[in-house]
């Protein structure tokens, strides 16, 4: 029987790949790639030639059984996403679950994921936070946000550059234009940008020009009442 490795890849700067990730990619028989063209660039950078199989959100349900059979047949497989850690707002969960159901050993390597540097760069509390990933674009979006209205922990969202301003406006309407937030863009790349301010200030900043790159929004949680305020509410 083979084995499944989940291998994180750089979120922008190719030099951020770990030595262990390189060793695993050298060793495996097959690399499952979210986009084979993107992964080929990384493999070429590392001087590697591998069998590449396409494995993305549009084909994973149809492909997962075949992949598991391949591993059960003795092949060692690595799953990578275009950037970051597989399974975090990327394909991976379904394959991992199916492998475990079939007794296949799964090993996940530690490595890059965009929300960690964005969270730390924000300056907001990192002790407790909730990762929301990509919000639904239409169905269920309002309900999801309504569920977060009372959230006191720092919240983290992924967003596309094309929807950033629209999402910030929606956040301002729900959470208040004076709620503190931060936006990280193009993390680890040449034009990395980290902007912090109120939601209104962020709307003004990113409305001034075209937004490009991968986006992480970090939203401060609902401020907790001071103890004397909470006591007053109880007395009322």
Predicted regions and their residues:
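Glycine-rich, flexible N-terminal cofactor/catalytic loop recognition
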Residues: 1-57
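Short glycine-rich anion-binding loops that position phosphate/pyrophosphate groups of nucleotides
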Residues: 11-14, 82-86, 161-163, 222-224
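Short active-site oxyanion
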Residues: 25-31, 104-106, 154-155
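Conserved helicase motor
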Residues: 54-61, 134-136
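Glycine/small-residue-rich loop that forms an oxyanion/phosphate-binding "nest" at active or ligand-binding sites
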Residues: 56, 64-113
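A contiguous loop/helix-start segment that scaffolds small-molecule binding in enzyme catalytic cores
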Residues: 75, 154, 158-236
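Class I SAM-dependent methyltransferase SAM-binding "motif I" and its flanking Rossmann-like core
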Residues: 94-151
């Amino acid at each position: 029987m083979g084995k499944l490795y989940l291998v994180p890849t750089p979120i922008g700067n190719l030099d951020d790949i770990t030595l262990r990730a390189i060793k695993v990619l050298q060793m495996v028989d097959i690399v499952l790639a979210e986009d084979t063209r993107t992964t080929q660039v990384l493999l070429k950078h590392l001087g590697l030639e591998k069998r590449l199989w396409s494995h993305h959100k549009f084909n994973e349900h149809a492909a997962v059984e075949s992949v598991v059979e391949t591993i059960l047949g003795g092949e060692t497989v690595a799953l990578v996403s275009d950037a970051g850690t597989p399974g975090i707002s990327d394909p991976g969960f379904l394959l991992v679950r199916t492998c475990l159901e079939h007794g296949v050993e799964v090993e996940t390597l530690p490595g890059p994921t965009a929300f960690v540097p964005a969270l730390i760069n924000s300056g907001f509390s990192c002790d407790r936070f909730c990762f929301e990933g990509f919000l639904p674009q239409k169905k269920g979006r309002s309900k999801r946000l309504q569920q977060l209205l009372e959230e006191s922990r720092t919240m983290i969202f992924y967003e596309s550059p094309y929807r950033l301003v629209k999402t910030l406006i929606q956040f301002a309407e729900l959470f208040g234009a004076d709620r503190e937030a931060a936006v990280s863009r193009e993390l680890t790349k040449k034009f990395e940008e980290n902007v912090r301010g109120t939601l209104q200030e962020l709307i003004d900043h990113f409305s001034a020009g075209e937004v490009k790159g991968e986006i992480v929004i970090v939203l401060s949680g609902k401020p907790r009442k001071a103890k004397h305020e909470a006591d007053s509410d109880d007395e009322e």
